[in-house]
Curated annotation (Swiss-Prot):
InterPro entries: Na/ntran_symport (IPR000175), Na/ntran_symport_glycine_GLY1 (IPR003028), SNS_sf (IPR037272). Residues 627-638 are annotated as: Essential for interaction with EXOC1. The gene is Slc6a9. Sodium- and chloride-dependent glycine transporter. Essential for regulating glycine concentrations at inhibitory glycinergic synapses. This is Sodium- and chloride-dependent glycine transporter 1. Inhibited by sarcosine.
């Protein structure tokens, strides 16, 4: 995507992303903190964007929507919606050096968008860590000579269990071996029954109840693993981005090592090529279906983490002149390339399993928890040294989940700290992190009950679905049309040394909002009542799901009304104008960067359409302002 940057205004070397050593201290936010280096930010953002959905959702969508033909609408949506929205959120957070609440000094009436992002991140953070805890449980269960879901001779198995491997049918009692010959008859028989991996998942790990309202007992092994996962997340964030930035060197890179190991092992198996061809073979007639384009747009939108608040938060710890345009392109492409790569890993193993059973790949393909905890583990039992491959697979899932969970927790903590906005809360940030982690653990306990998986899927389907689309659409409109696209383009030029490329300007103003609106319409049209296997959710549960979805969106009009009521003005129109006008403390956080219309003055700047924070002309001071409007001035330590 070669697009000219346009005319470059007067800029220093640091404005192009390279901060010279003598200017490094001047570009650091000593009060709030920055990333140790830019690699930490890129790796953290990759870990945030590349999550479980890349492994268990994209490959399934690809083969269901035309195989290789799905790649065409997928990458079209990446270019015209994914990367532009990613760049917008990164530049938004980096320019203001504030989290998802503080950035709305740009237009205080829309601060409800930030609260909506917090609500979404809260929901996702609660259930996402439960998925990680289940991966921990499977990881620990894999530390054995024989995987516990390989056979049907366990206490929890039922007479309906029928597995590919069975100790009673082995020809060699000293070593587990696969049944010889064409196993299609066995698989057809199994279709009428249940696999050992499914019974292990449903009857042993979950002890699944019959109804979402029947919580039964809390599964203590899962509760323990949930505690482990929250402790790991807290320890990695104990010093904020300073500590998590070091952890991501491992958590963001090692999954690629595991993916590569599994890929090499997978493609050497008999039947792997068939699985990969099933994944990639294009069905070009599919691209004429609106559903395929809708799935492509939705997958791009959700997999990049747009409108969660995490991108704004992570970028807020960048140095002011960091080249976030470059970063957004790199991270977005890495995320999508990982999805495609994961598809090879998944379908090579599933192809091997289908070949072993003598059935079509579609009979063993699945997505979501069904892929991660039933289908793929079942396939791994067919491999020699299966516990080793199982350990690697679930360790990869744990790391992928943690990378996203770090940013979800940091989003909430940063929003709280920025909102209070005083030195005391900055000093107590570790305790804020601990408090949020403990609250997340307590709220996740019901999801470890016997009905927990029902609630987890309910939250996944409703809490972070169409609400994200609404939030993102309103964010685009408020920045481009309320604050003004010219103002925002000037802000980016001031920060990067060049304005956003013309392509991005067009996408932000017209193309991306249109695509977002299309996703919203598609989501509504394609809505189907949620089910889990053959279980139909009752109406009251679906109603709770819609309430969760609305709880984030409703923050936007409620806060807008609140802001209108507290804003001065003789008429409603005057109040509306004042409530949408940038606050006096909007702009770069550091005094050194407040140039042009943000330069410290003792009088308003009416020609720019909004006022800037007055600063004492004789003494360098940094405005320390809570996003609730309270402010104080602190002597600059720079």
């Amino acid at each position: 995507m070669a697009v000219a940057h346009g005319p470059v205004a007067t800029s220093s070397p640091e404005q192009n992303g390279a901060v010279p050593s003598e200017a490094t201290k001047k570009d650091q936010n000593l009060t709030r903190g920055n990333w140790g280096n830019q690699i930490e930010f890129v790796l953290t953002s990759v870990g945030y964007a590349v999550g479980l959905g890349n492994v268990w959702r994209f490959p399934y969508l690809c083969y269901r929507n035309g195989g290789g033909a799905f790649m065409f609408p997928y990458f079209i949506m990446l270019v015209f919606c994914g990367i532009p929205l990613f760049f917008m959120e990164l530049s938004f957070g980096q320019f203001a050096s504030q989290g998802c609440l503080g950035v709305w000094r740009i237009s205080p009436m829309f601060k409800g968008v930030g609260y909506g992002m917090m609500v979404v991140s809260t929901y996702i953070g609660i259930y996402y860590n439960v998925v990680i805890c289940i991966a921990f449980y499977y990881f620990f269960s894999s530390m054995t000579h024989v995987l516990p879901w390989a056979y049907c001779n366990n206490p929890w198995n039922t007479p309906d269990c029928a597995g590919v491997l069975d100790a009673s049918n082995l020809t060699n009692g000293s070593r587990p071996t696969a049944l010889s010959g064409n196993l299609s008859h066995l698989f057809n028989y199994t279709l009428q029954r249940t696999s050992p991996s499914e019974e292990y998942w449903r009857l042993y790990v979950l002890k699944l109840s019959d109804d979402i309202g029947d919580f039964g007992e809390v599964r203590l092994p899962l509760l323990g693993c949930l505690g482990v996962s929250w402790v790991v997340v807290f320890l990695c964030l104990i010093r904020g981005v300073k500590s998590s930035g070091k952890v991501v060197y491992f958590t963001a890179t090692f999954p690629y090592v595991v993916l590569t190991i599994l890929f090499v092992r997978g493609v050497t198996l008999e039947g792997a090529f068939t699985g990969i061809m099933y994944y990639l073979t294009p069905k070009w007639d599919k691209i004429l279906e609106a559903k395929v384009w809708g799935d492509a747009a939705s997958q791009i939108f959700y997999s990049l983490g747009c409108a969660w608040g995490g991108l704004i938060t992570m970028a807020s710890y960048n140095k002011f002149h960091n080249n976030c345009y470059r970063d957004s392109v790199i991270i977005s492409i890495t995320n999508c390339a990982t999805s495609v790569y994961a598809g090879f890993v998944i379908f090579s193993i599933l192809g091997f399993m289908a070949n072993h059973l003598g059935v079509d790949v579609s009979r063993v393909a699945d997505h979501g928890p069904g892929l991660a905890f039933v289908a793929y583990p079942e396939a791994l039992t067919l491999l020699p040294i299966s516990p080793l491959w199982s350990l690697l697979f679930f360790f990869m899932l744990i790391l992928l989940g943690l990378g996203t969970q770090f940013c979800l927790l940091e989003t909430l903590v940063t929003a709280i700290v920025d909102e209070v906005g005083n030195e005391w809360i900055l000093q107590k940030k570790t305790y804020v992190t601990l408090g949020v982690a403990v609250a997340g653990f307590l709220l996740g306990i019901p999801l470890t009950s016997q009905a927990g998986i029902y609630w987890l899927l309910l939250m996944d389907n409703y809490a972070a679905s169409f609400s994200l689309v609404v939030i993102s659409c309103i964010m685009c409109v408020s920045i481009m049309y309320i604050y003004g696209h010219r103002n925002y383009f000037q802000d980016i030029q001031m920060m990067l040394g060049f304005p956003p490329p013309l392509f991005f300007q067009i996408c932000w103003r017209f193309v991306s909002p249109t695509i977002i609106f299309f996703i919203l319409i598609f989501t509504v049209i394609q809505y189907r009542p949620i089910t889990y296997n053959h279980y139909q959710y009752p109406g009251w549960a679906v109603a709770i799901g819609f309430l969760m979805a609305l709880s984030s969106v409703i923050c936007i009009p409620l806060y807008a009304l609140f802001q209108l009521c507290r804003t001065d003005g003789d008429t409603l129109l005057q109040r509306l104008k004042n409530a949408t006008k940038p606050s006096r403390d909007w702009g770069p956080a550091l005094l050194e960067h407040r140039t042009g219309r943000y330069a410290p003055t003792t009088t308003p700047s009416p020609e720019d359409g909004f006022e800037v924070q007055p600063l004492h002309p004789d003494k360098a001071q940094i405005p320390i302002v809570g996003s609730n409007g309270s402010s104080r001035l602190q002597d600059s330590r720079i």
